[in-house]
Amino acid sequence: VYPHFKTPIQCRFLTSDSISIRRRTAVSRWRSPTFSANYNGVNAQVLGVLKQEQKEIEEEKRSSSLAEKLRLGSLTEDGLSYKEKFIVRCYEVGINKTATVETIANLLQEVGGNHAQSVGFSTDGFATTPTMRKLHLIWVTARMHIEIYRYPAWSDVVEIETWCQSEGRIGTRRDWIIKDFATDEVIGRATSKWVMMNQDTRRLQKVSDDVRDEYLVFCPKTPRLSFPEENNKSLKKISKLEDPAQHSRLGLSPRRADLDMNQHVNNVAYIGWVLESIPKEVLYTHELETITLDYRRECQHDDVVDSLTSPEVDEDTAVTKIIGTNGHAAAATEARDDSLKFLHFLRVSGQGLEINRGRTEWRKKSEKR
């Protein structure tokens, strides 16, 4: 037993100048500043083995972080989706003491990133695979669709399940089911499409087979959709809003807090900009039920943004009502004439370049509120 280690090690001499070491339990993570000096007479191969073991220990320590131990989430039994529970905090609710749509969108983003970490991806926070990091590739949002059937209130606990799967040859998709953890009621669903961008050139890039092979092993083998209904709202094309818009909010600037780790404006910030041009009287009488956003252009930190909104003329007044709880259930429709629908358009101020187009649907607030 060497006096410099807290646990015993075994040495087996292969030749006069070759030594092999096997650890019985764990080499102490303490490293003496005079480590090399104390072992000047030991074969360099031993030092190499010890350094490699130290490196493996540090990697193991990082992979089993304190955050992962305390996080209320884990992979499902089949390993093909991820569930996590969240408590709605006081700073995440609005005037009605219910979570805002931005809060919901942030939780969706958080659980997606945690899912990637749980399968060994996203060591840099970008939900990227090893090949993507090697080639400086990142995922960016192309489309987001969120439906909220009941907003969770302050101190409620929600459980969000998420999974990803391939979406053609140019992207991937991620879906979510949001439940009230206390009742197991589905209170929201969401789906999104992501495309690959080169972080250096900021140009979109086709998803290679190498990248696809890395993440498909963690995806459902058969398509699983959070919106399995035929002709559901997530599939609806968003018409372009034509000028002049009935409502507008001009001169919006990205804040420093709006920038994410990819050095561009976080996709949740666009939701806030879209809602800036909603008439105030609508906010008093209605609450957001559905939002769909198509991301057309990357917004830079020094861009100035105009938010435009006009009512959507649409003969379809049906609203989806959830019956099941697993994301595969059928949906029923019921006529409703108190809902409001709007088209949205975000552009670079002064240039007219399209950043984002969107569609929202609003339901009448409950009388209880």
Curated annotation (Swiss-Prot):
Function per UniProt: Plays an essential role in chain termination during de novo fatty acid synthesis. High thioesterase activity for oleoyl-ACP versus other acyl-ACPs.
Record-annotated active site: N262, H264, C299
Protein name in UniProt: Oleoyl-acyl carrier protein thioesterase, chloroplastic
Subcellular location, principal: plastid
Entry keyword set: Chloroplast, Fatty acid biosynthesis, Fatty acid metabolism, Hydrolase, Lipid biosynthesis, Lipid metabolism, Plastid, Transit peptide
Compartments in which it is found: Plastid, Chloroplast
Tagged with keyword Lipid metabolism: yes
Catalytic activity: (9Z)-octadecenoyl-[ACP] + H2O = (9Z)-octadecenoate + holo-[ACP] + H(+)
Domain of life: Eukaryota
A single cellular component GO annotation: chloroplast
E.C. numbers: 3.1.2.14
GO molecular function annotations of the record: acyl carrier activity; fatty acyl-[ACP] hydrolase activity
Similarity comment text for this entry: Belongs to the acyl-ACP thioesterase family.
Lineage, uppermost ranks: Eukaryota, Viridiplantae, Streptophyta, Embryophyta, Tracheophyta
Pfam families referenced in this protein's UniProt entry, alphabetically: Acyl-ACP_TE, Acyl-ACP_TE_C
